[in-house]
Amino acid sequence: MFKKTLISLSIVLPLLFLGCSSDSDEEKSMVASSTFHLVDTKGVDYNVTKEGLNFYVKGHDGKVVMFDIFATWCPPCRAEAPNLSHLQKKYNDELLILGVTIEDGIANADLDAFKEKYGAEYAIVNSKDNEKLYRAIASATKAGQRFPIPFMVMYKDGQYITHYVGQTPEEMIESDIKKALGK
């Protein structure tokens, strides 16, 4: 009997300790460095580098960068498009808004139709790296792998500023942009 208990414990205890490991794949990926190559509907390239929890967009140092993770079928995403366009125009030299669609296989023509219909006058990227990027951002912000949209995340010089879940008033976003810019 003692022998069976000892054998059982020698099998079960290592399995328990494996389950208690603090280095999950998600945590490891948060520390790792990655580069995401994004292309908008006009063919403009954006290279986003993730270093730890920070996200940098090459060539946009000093700007506030906001990733708008959205879908064309999402009513709150549609409603926010004109507000984001207004902010992009107002803070043009200090702000970069990148719309990141969660829709696989959507045609650029469909995204351009969305931009036209809902007044989205900011870059919308449609690349094979979209999903990798929005999952990395969701992981870094601890939003989980299933998060509501729109999901917007703001960075300044790669550093996380804030994020918004769901439709957010333009005034709230603008207030955070001003704070990030030191205004």
Residue ranges and their predicted role:
Residues M1-N47, K183:
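N-terminal targeting signals for export/organelle localization
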Residues L38-V65:
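A short beta-strand-turn-helix
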Residues V48-T49, A123-S127:
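Short acidic-hydrophobic, aromatic-tinged amphipathic segments that line or gate anion-handling sites
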Residues K63-V65, I69-W73, D104, P148:
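Short pre-active-site segment immediately N-terminal to redox-active cysteine/selenocysteine motifs
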Residues M66-F67, I97, M152:
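Hydrophobic beta-strand anchors of alpha/beta hydrolase catalytic cores
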Residues I69-F70, V100-E103, S127-K128, V165-Q167:
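Active-site-proximal beta-strand/loop segments in catalytic clefts of secreted hydrolases
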Residues A79-G119, E131-S139:
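Structural microenvironment flanking redox-active thiols in thiol-disulfide oxidoreductases
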Residues Y118-A120, K128-K178:
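Thiol/disulfide oxidoreductase modules built on the thioredoxin-like
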